[in-house]
């Protein structure tokens, strides 16, 4: 039985990577997402088998038929802080291509990597310059740009806060539960949660079917306590059945998405 679609719960194709690489067509994914009660989909750029206009129109039609929103196209490569100008130009051209793809298929956002360099003043300058160029193209296509607490430049809250301030509200932030290992996430995620407009809500499964619910709910609590109102995009990358695991995660996230949890104290 299909579940009602929830507009604040979605899934990334990274969570379905095993199925897709085993042969499930990307065109079939929107209907699967809808059947599991999730209203949003994110697609990794490398999961597109083609980017010609005919294929993109077919995928857009599949999304519309399923009633699923293409929330973010995830651009999973590119270093805007490379010291090599030619490499930065190549990265910008690549990102521009995927912005055009996003616009054609109806994606509301693209997620880009802010940089692979350590967060120095020069690397932050290069990142801002590159992101402003990305924004110039994205704005022309009506696509919002977000980045993530991911890769060396944005591996610590201070650098994220600095870059977001310098971008003056033009850049969004995706908060990923799984990018900062160990207990540091419980210290660092609260510092950036007030800036986040969407999450990658990753739960770990130490064994197939056995979710670390304590860690997952602790991360969800951090977002709730920061006043987070955006969508939670579910991320699964452990052994076990993908949809069974994602269904477990959806049940945990649902009270947070409908606002029925309360702060302790």
Regions flagged by a language model, labelled:
Residues 48-49, 78, 117, 153, ...:
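Positions that flank functional sites
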């Amino acid at each position: 039985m299909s579940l009602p679609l929830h507009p604040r719960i979605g899934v990334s194709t990274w969570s379905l990577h095993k199925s897709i690489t085993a042969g499930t067509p990307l065109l079939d994914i929107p209907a699967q997402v809808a059947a599991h009660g999730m209203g949003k989909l994110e697609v990794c750029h490398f999961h597109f088998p083609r980017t010609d206009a005919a294929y993109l129109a077919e995928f857009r039609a599949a999304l519309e038929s399923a009633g699923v929103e293409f929330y973010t196209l995830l651009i999973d490569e590119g270093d805007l802080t490379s010291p090599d100008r030619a490499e930065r130009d190549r990265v910008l051209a690549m990102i521009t291509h995927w912005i055009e793809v996003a616009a054609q298929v109806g994606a509301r956002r693209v997620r880009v990597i802010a940089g692979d360099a350590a967060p120095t003043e020069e690397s932050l300058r290069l990142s801002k310059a590159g992101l402003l160029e990305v924004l110039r193209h994205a704005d022309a296509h009506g696509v919002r740009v977000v980045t993530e607490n991911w890769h060396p430049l944005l591996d610590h809250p201070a650098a994220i806060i600095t870059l977001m301030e310098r971008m003056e509200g033009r850049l969004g932030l995706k908060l990923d539960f799984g990018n900062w290992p160990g207990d540091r996430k419980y210290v660092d995620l609260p510092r950036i949660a007030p800036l986040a407009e969407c999450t990658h809500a990753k739960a770990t499964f130490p064994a197939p079917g056995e979710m670390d619910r304590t860690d997952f709910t602790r991360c969800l609590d951090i977002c709730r306590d920061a006043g987070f109102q955006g969508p939670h995009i579910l991320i699964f990358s452990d052994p076990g059945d993908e949809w069974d695991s994602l269904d477990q995660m959806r049940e945990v996230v649902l009270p947070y998405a409908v606002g029925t949890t309360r702060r302790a104290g």
